[in-house]
Structure formats: C-alpha cells, structure tokens
C-alpha cells in the first residue's frame, strides 16, 4: 500500500505496533489504534475441477453447501443482492465434497545445517479457487480509494508469500 501512497492504512487496519519502537508493550497509547474496517472471513464459493472438455483444463464448480453460508452472512450484514460475476456449475453436494477431500497436501520441512528439525504438512487450496468476503467500513471515501488499490494488482494475504502462497486477485462483485 505504501507504493500507492495510501495515506489511510492505519485507519483501515489500525496502527502497526511493530513499526514504532515507542510502542513496546502497548505503552504509547497515542500511537495504538484499532482498524476501522472489518474484514469478514473468506468463504469458498467455487473450486476448480479437472474438465473432460478438450478446450478447457478445468471448470469451476460450486454447490448449495458452499453458497448457503455466504448467502446467510450477506443477509445478516444487510447485503441484499451480491452479484456473482461468473457462472459456476452447480454440483450435487456430495460430489463436490469428494473433490474437496482430495486437496493437495504439501510436506514442509525446516532444515537446520542439513538436519531435519521439524516436518509438517500443509493442505493448500488450488489456484483459481473463488472465495467471497465482505468488508464493513465507516468512511465511503476511504473505502473507495482502498477498493481501487486492492483491485489493481495481485494482493498477498497471510504467510509464505516467498513460496507463492496467498496471492490473489480481488474483484468487487
């Protein structure tokens, strides 16, 4: 966000305690603030499944079990019609869950001087998966500017960006 000269980063997310040495142990309350935007959880809406069609590598599938929690949250937040910009193939609930049971699992290992220190496994969501999340905010002008920035480029969310995790394209629906 700093490369875009976004002046309201603290307003959106709150102050970053780690940026300011004065804020050790939250002692400097004038610099400590909570963000004014609320980002609700991202719910899986559609999942890429291998296509048997020669012209397409994958198709996006969804089901009522994936859509219902999104619709319920939208209703609870007062969002009457959120528009899905893509059409997905509606699958029977059990069939799509079979695909979801087989998410890729990647073994990760921390090496220290060539010696294995810690082996763990991570389940990853395939590229091209579609999620929906909602944002509530207190300032329309700040939100418009923020929204423009997050839709311009890829955004990296969460950890492990150095190994390609968490990169996403955000599109307003």
Segments (PLM) and residue ranges:
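RNA-binding basic/glycine-rich loop and surface signature characteristic of RAMP-family CRISPR effectors
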Residues: 1-173
């Amino acid at each position: 966000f700093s490369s875009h000269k976004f002046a309201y980063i603290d307003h959106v997310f709150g102050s970053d305690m780690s940026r300011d040495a004065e804020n050790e142990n939250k002692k400097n309350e004038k610099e400590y603030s909570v963000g004014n935007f609320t980002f609700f959880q991202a719910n899986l809406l559609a999942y890429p499944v291998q296509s048997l069609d020669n012209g397409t590598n994958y198709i996006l599938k969804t089901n009522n079990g994936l859509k219902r929690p999104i619709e319920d949250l939208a209703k609870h937040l007062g969002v009457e019609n959120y528009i899905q910009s893509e059409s997905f193939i509606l699958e029977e609930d059990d069939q799509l869950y079979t695909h979801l049971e087989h998410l890729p699992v990647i073994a990760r290992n921390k090496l220290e001087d060539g010696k294995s220190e810690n082996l763990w496994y991570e389940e990853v969501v395939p590229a091209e998966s579609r999620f929906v999340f909602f944002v509530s905010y207190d300032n329309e002008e700040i939100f418009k500017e923020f929204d423009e920035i997050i839709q311009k480029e890829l955004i990296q969310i969460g950890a492990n960006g150095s190994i390609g995790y968490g990169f996403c394209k955000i599109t307003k629906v």
